[in-house]
Structures are given as C-alpha cells and as structure tokens.
Design a protein with these regions (language model features):
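A short acidic-Thr-Gly-centered motif at the start of a beta-strand
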Residues: 1-17, 244-245
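Short, structured active-site-proximal loop/turn typified by the sulfatase FGly-forming signature C/S-X-P-X-R
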Residues: 33-83, 128-130
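Anion (oxyanion) recognition and catalysis
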Residues: 57, 123, 244-245
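Acidic/histidine-rich catalytic neighborhood
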Residues: 241, 258-307
Length: 422
C-alpha cells in the first residue's frame, strides 16, 4: 500500500489507493429540510431513474454538506480543489471589482488564484490528473500548476473540446474519441460530454485523480422531480455506473443548490439595489453582482448575493438602512462581518454585502438586466438558502467531524474511506 501523504494548504491528503473521481454537479439542489421540491438526486431515485445513486443511498455514503457563500460556481469549484475557503484561495465570485485598476472583470484569470490546488500538488508529486469542465470559464483556473507539457495531466472543457490540443490541454481528437459532437453551451449535452469524456479517459489514461465539473443549465430551467431533470440525472447515473465498474472511488458534491425565485404567475422576484440606494439619497456607490458571467440565459445575472462599494465612509449607515424592512432581504453585512462569517478575501469584497431570502434575487437596476433569455420561471442561487449541497461517496467513510463542507470532499474521501467498502 502507498502510505504517501501530500500536504496542500495546511491539509494532509493520503495518496489514492485507486483512481478517485470527484464530481461537482453544478446547481444540484439536495433533498432534506428546506429543499426545493425534494432535491434532484432524491427525486430521481424515488422515480426509479437512478439505480446506481439509489444503491449509494442504501449502502455507501449519502449525506450533505455546506458550500461556500456566495453560493456561486467559481468560488466553490476553487474551494473544492484547494480544500480551503475563498479567504485563502482568493476567488470570491464569478465576477468582481478590481479596485486597483478601477475595472469590473470576470474572475477567470489564473493570476487571481492565491493558493495551489490539490490537483496540481498531486500531479507535481507524480500523480496522473485529468480535469474536464463543462464551461471553459473554469478550465484555466482549475488547470493552474498542472504539468500538461509533461504528459501527466489533461485539462479541457466540453464547450471547446474541438479546440483541445496536446500542447495546451494534454489531449487531442477528444471529440472523435468520445463520439459526440461539441454540444451547445445551453444544453444538457454539455454536461453529458464531461461524463462521456471522463469514461474515455479513465479507460485510456486511468488517472489517479479526475475532477469533473458540470453546468447547471438544466437546474436553472427545471425543478427537481420534473421529467427533464430526472432524465438528466438518469444520464449521469449511467456514466457513474460505468466508472464504478472500473474500480474507482467516486465522490459527488455540488458548488451550490438551486431555488425557485419567481412569483406564482412566473415573473421573477427581483430586488433592484441601485434604486433603493438612490431613494436613500446616495449617489456615489457601485453595486457588484458576483453571479455575473457570460451565460445570462441561465439566470439573467440575478442571484442571491451582492456587494456594494461606497465612495464615502460616512454613507455606510445610511446605505445599510436603505434595505431595512425590504421584503426579500435576508441580511446586510459589513465587509468585516461578511469576511468573518463566510471566509472571504477582504480586498475583493465591497463595503457591504446584501443577501436575499430563498424566494428572491438581487439586481442592480432594471435597465441593466436583459431578461429576454429567461424563457422559464427564474431559478437561481447565491445566498444562504442555496448553501446545502450533496456529499455522496461510493465508499463508506469513517466518522468525520460535523460541520462538513463541500471542500472537505477530497480530504474525507482520500483520508477516511474504508477499504473494501462499496
């Protein structure tokens, strides 16, 4: 047995005894108390659509954990692969305000990452690593530190799979090998390609560690238990069954949950922050919505978490009071409060943080949001109500401390999986 341990960001990880596949199921709202319509996986199991996941609920590890707040894609994927909160790795949203350069930018550049990843540290210690994402926006961040040129790592997205090259991605011809056309970015097939490619690489490369990250296009459009949602999880179940048959350890979690954010008639429940601040007499401020990314058809840049920059320190109390008693506002925190509670980097967060309740989302101003792409009642995420996520492993785990987080998935699976369990 290999007793080698790898230390990453002050956490120790055992060398995998068999290949480990960690899957981040984007937007996978879980079941249990406070869930939206019973949870995606649970409803699919109850409908008889996912026999493999049903077997894990019966005889393996089937539980829950908390994700990072803001409950968005980038901060949580990077927390999962670094094992630490955003206060340490620096990625606190999909989008942020660069105060040094006075510019609002997508948080996709590898230079923004402040901590090494578990993937890179294992790769540099001799492990073969494969990373497959649905959206290309995550690829460069997740691939930081991987030895692509040395041939021991692969990192590509299904979105741009036809552009994958040996020199930049560690693989070529993957579209032909998978046998699927490059999917549309707004499709279930974008995630299916991730799983299909994962099976192909597990057969040909057999990496020691594989990280698969899907897209939440389906979850934004379809509630748990609906036919389309159940079909999506049935597809995923089939690929997980094939991976399990290859003798790998499979660990599933999510970057965030997903809740309905609309009124009974279907119109979105939006609180626009700029008009409220204006009504309070404020003029010098900047509202940042960290959910912002290029894929506005998913959510219209409307999420449950916003941060506000104020030009004048004297405006703090008045700005905070602007949201008093507003229906749909769950909490308003100062920068220090938010960083202490949620583990966020203080230099990348505004003076105030606003979080909405489970039924509402936050916007900047009506004219700044193009909602024409929202063909279905809005479902979104970002706040405390989407913090609970699945934590599922096809092995039994030793008893672990309470307060489990999604970014504990590597630690718990590598360090606490019971040998021979399945």
């Amino acid at each position: 047995m290999n007793n080698k341990m790898i230390s990453v960001n002050q956490r120790d990880y055992a060398w995998p005894r068999q290949p480990l596949v960690v899957v981040c199921i984007d937007g996978s709202e879980p079941g249990g108390e406070g869930s939206d319509q019973g949870g995606y996986i649970e409803r699919a199991i109850d409908a008889g659509q996912t026999p493999f996941l049903a077997s894990l609920r019966e005889k393996a590890t089937f539980g829950y954990a908390d994700c990072v707040v803001p409950s968005f894609t980038n901060p949580n994927n990077l927390s999962i692969v670094t094992g630490v909160p955003p206060s340490e790795h620096g990625i606190c949203g999909n989008f942020y305000y660069d105060t040094d350069n006075d510019v609002e930018v997508m948080m996709n550049d590898p230079s923004l990452l402040r901590a090494p990843t578990i993937l890179a540290e294992f790769n540099q210690a001799g492990a073969k690593v494969a990373v497959i994402t649905a959206k290309d926006k995550l690829r460069r961040l997740l691939g930081v530190g991987l030895d692509i040129a040395g041939g021991s790592a692969v990192c590509f997205s299904s979105e741009l799979a036809d552009q994958a090259t040996l020199s930049e991605h560690g693989v070529e011809g993957i579209v032909d090998r998978v046998g699927m056309p490059v999917p549309d970015v707004y499709s279930a097939e974008l995630s299916e390609f991730v799983f299909a490619a994962g099976v192909v690489l597990m057969k040909s490369m057999r990496p020691d560690i594989m990280y698969l990250s899907t897209t939440d296009y389906i979850q934004h459009k379809h509630a748990p238990g609906t036919p389309v949602a159940n079909a999506f999880y049935a597809m995923m179940d089939q690929y997980l069954t094939r991976l399990d048959a290859m003798g790998v350890t499979i660990a599933l979690t999510a970057d965030h949950g997903m809740k309905a954010k609309h009124a009974p008639a279907g119109e979105p429940n939006v609180i626009y922050l700029e008009p409220l601040l204006g009504e309070a007499g404020l003029t010098e401020f900047r509202v940042i919505l960290p959910i912002t990314d290029p894929y506005v058809v998913h959510h219209g840049a409307l999420g449950g978490f916003a941060t506000i920059y104020l030009d004048n320190d004297s405006d703090h109390a008045r700005a905070r009071a602007a949201f008093d008693g507003v229906p749909g506002i769950e909490t308003v925190l100062t920068r220090n409060e938010a960083c202490n509670v949620f583990g966020l980097p203080a230099d990348r967060i505004g003076d105030l943080v606003v979080i909405s309740t489970r039924d509402y989302v936050l916007g900047s101003a009506p004219e700044k949001h193009d909602l024409s792409g929202l063909k279905d009642p809005l479902r979104s995420h970002g706040g405390l109500s989407e913090q609970r996520v699945p934590f599922i492993v096809n092995r039994c785990l030793e008893a672990c401390a309470t307060g489990r987080r999604n970014f504990d998935i590597f630690s718990h699976t590598l360090n606490h999986a019971l040998e021979g369990s399945s």
